[in-house]
Every structure is written in C-alpha cells, then in structure tokens.
Amino acid sequence: YLLSMTPSAITTSDAGAGIGYTTLRVRGTDGTRINVTANGIPINDAESHNVFWVNLPDFASSVKDMQIQRGAGTSTNGAGAFGASINMQTGDFSLKPYAELNGSYGSFNTHKETVKAGTGLINDHWSFDARLSNISSDGYIDRASVGLNSYYLQGGYYSDNTSIKLITFG
C-alpha cells in the first residue's frame, strides 16, 4: 500500500489490510507489465514477469528513494515496462554507528516490529547494516491472517573512487 496514493496507481490486498498478497496496477496495466528494480536489479519473476510483493515484506524499511515512471519506458529485463517502471534505491552507508527499534500497531491486530543496526564507517572504508522485521495481522477478512518475517543485510567497501556494496534480503 506504499504506492496507493500515487496518481494512476491502484493497489489491492487479499486480506484487506495491505499486508501479504497485494497487487499493483498502474494506468490500468497489471503487474506483469510493470518493470520493478532494486538498485537497478530486476525484481520481476523471470517466468511470469509479475512481482510477488509478499516475498518482499517490509523491504520499504530499507528503501531510501523510489522513482516511478508511468507509461511506456525503458526496461532492464525484457519488454515489461509498458505500464510503468519502478526503481527502488536502498539506503547508503552510515558514517556513525546506530541502532533503531520501531513498532507500530493498527486495526485488525495489525502490528509491525523492526530492529535496525549499523556499524558506521569502520577503518574509513567498511560499513555493515542489518534489519529484522516482523509484520502480523488478523486481516479484515475472516481467516485472512498474515505473519511475515524479513531480514536485510548490507555490507560495503567505500573509498574516494570505489564503492562496492553487497546486499541480501528475504
């Protein structure tokens, strides 16, 4: 539901709470015609070209910027950018160590807990960040509960002319 207020975008959710199996349509085209990338790397399924957002629970907590280009556009992985192109950029490294604990609660026993931590810049070149999340909801519809856990790990080497970043999430 992060994109639900975007002009010409429609989002739906099976459970009715915006968590779990959700779909996105832009300018009337379904998800198979929307090219979605994270840091320029395709997120779309290789076979159906759809994006299964349920496999990216709380990925938005690690996104610093998102660009949406509505309509036909260039595609990085085939001819799927007829409806739109969405590029998500993950956060940069932090110069100082940090730790965050976030929690939220809403209707239908919907709650989210997130723990984030980062080392800051180590020896002026290395940085590591991590996030753990839990999202749960009873859902608006009977027997439509959701329980999702996710992680995000990022490590990188940074210098004046070089930036190498390794990211894994699930």
Where do the PLM segments sit?
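Extracytoplasmic beta-strand/coil segments of soluble accessory domains associated
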Residues: 3-42, 64
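Outer-membrane beta-barrel domain signature
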Residues: 13, 73-77, 102-105, 140-143
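Membrane-embedded beta-strand positions in outer-membrane beta-barrel channels/transporters
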Residues: 23, 53, 65, 85, ...
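Short acidic/polar hinge/loop motifs at secondary-structure boundaries
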Residues: 42-70, 89
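Extracytoplasmic loops and strand-loop junctions of Gram-negative outer membrane beta-barrel proteins
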Residues: 48-49, 68-70, 97-100, 134-138, ...
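Transmembrane beta-strand segments of Gram-negative outer membrane beta-barrel proteins
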Residues: 63-68, 84, 90-105, 128-132
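Short loop/turn motifs that connect adjacent beta-strands in outer-membrane beta-barrel proteins
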Residues: 77, 93-98, 122-126, 161
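Transmembrane beta-barrel wall of Gram-negative outer-membrane proteins
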Residues: 105-136, 141-170
